[in-house]
Regions:
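Glycine-rich phosphate-binding loop and adjacent beta-alpha segment
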Residues: 233-291, 327-333
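N-terminal glycine-rich cofactor-binding segment
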Residues: 5-23, 40-69, 84, 102-116
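Glycine-rich beta-strand-centered segment in the early N-terminal region that forms part
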Residues: 20-36, 49-95, 134-136
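C-terminal hydrophobic helical "lid"/dimerization subdomain
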Residues: 1, 237, 282-333
Length: 333
């Protein structure tokens, strides 16, 4: 079967036609992949800022398709279902998993990063991680389901923290209007919150405004809730400077570099900083796939065929909005 693999020298993507086709094992389903989204973590792998376990390496993790076959122990009636794939697979037995915090599982497998990814014609995944998608979801909404779930989880966690002191929730700021930032806007608007948005790229700000956000004013502060989605080194200082007294800052973006922090500002304003990583199984995916269509596909701005994966990855960072790859059309089209 065809698959897109990452090579090491040079660090480029290529399509191979003879990648082994998987067979669904016990408790697994075989998914015929229709599309895969590109996110910042994928771009870091492509650029060499992250390392896969081996080369050549199948990339991709934001995935939708349809179930082509079922393994032993899975209802045969699931064949033909349109699904989105939950790519983070926890062990289910460690203390974090038993406490319901599967996002903190130290043993979780991550499609595209610790195990081979999804940018292939077919993949085998545990049946519990292939979520049926409502009939009214277009392909664009389905390909955005995974990062939308990341946003949903961050908002859910923030609301749990702010439940004791809900004041200021109507004043919300999203820092970073990349694909994760814009999808966080979509999720907030669905909750009845119109966030202010901060980003250096005018095209990204225009997209955020189309989605129901607004451009943050220069120097504007007093935000009771701040979502930092960019991971930019300077973003933490921006967040602490714009947060209201007693405000909550949710860190979603990843940054591996040391950053200067003025703790006096955090202490005097009595700010709360919280990290939010991916989502918890099964609740967050169940919530997002079980809800009405939020129109997440509106963040999409570019689509490439599988044969142009290298071009798609090379261009994605400069696109205001999200880029995805069409692997194959729906069955029968």
């Amino acid at each position: 079967m065809r698959a897109v693999v990452l090579d090491t020298e040079p660090r480029t993507l290529r399509v191979v036609s003879d990648w082994p086709e998987p067979e669904p094992g016990p408790g697994e389903v075989l998914v015929r992949v229709r599309g895969v989204g590109i996110c910042g973590s994928d771009l870091a792998l492509h650029a060499g800022r992250r390392q896969p376990p081996s080369f050549p390496w199948v990339v991709g993790h934001e995935t939708f398709g349809e179930i082509a076959a079922t393994g032993p122990g899975v209802e045969r009636g699931r064949t033909g279902q349109h699904v989105v794939v939950e790519p983070n697979i926890p062990c289910g037995t460690c203390p974090a998993c038993r406490a319901g915090r599967t996002s903190a599982c130290p043993h979780r497998k991550v499609l595209g990063f610790s195990v081979p990814g999804t940018l292939a014609e077919k993949i085998a995944v545990p049946a519990a991680y292939a979520w049926p998608v409502p009939d009214d979801w277009a392909d664009g909404d389905a390909v955005c389901a995974e990062p939308l779930t990341v946003a949903h989880a961050a908002i859910r966690r923030a609301m749990a923290v702010k439940a004791a002191a809900p004041a200021g929730l109507e004043r919300c700021l999203v820092i970073g209007a990349g694909s994760q930032g814009t999808l966080t806007c979509v999720a907030l608007v669905a909750c009845g919150i119109a966030p202010a948005v901060l980003d250096p790229q005018p095209g990204r700000l225009a997209l955020a405004a189309e989605l129901g956000g607004r451009v943050a004013e220069p120097g504007e502060g007093g935000f009771g809730l701040v979502f930092e989605t960019s991971g930019a080194p300077e973003a933490l200082a921006e967040a602490t400077g714009r947060a209201a007294r007693g405000g909550l800052i949710v860190l979603m973006g990843l940054n591996a570099q040391p950053v200067p922090v003025v703790t006096q500002r955090i202490v005097q304003r009595q700010l709360t900083l919280m990290g939010s990583l991916i989502y918890d199984h099964p609740g967050d995916f169940a919530a997002v796939t079980g809800e009405r269509n939020r129109g997440a596909g509106r963040v999409l701005r570019a689509c490439y065929p599988m044969a142009e994966a290298e071009t798609a990855f090379s261009a994605a960072a400069a696109v205001p909005g999200k880029t995805w790859i069409r692997v194959q059309p729906p069955e029968g089209s």
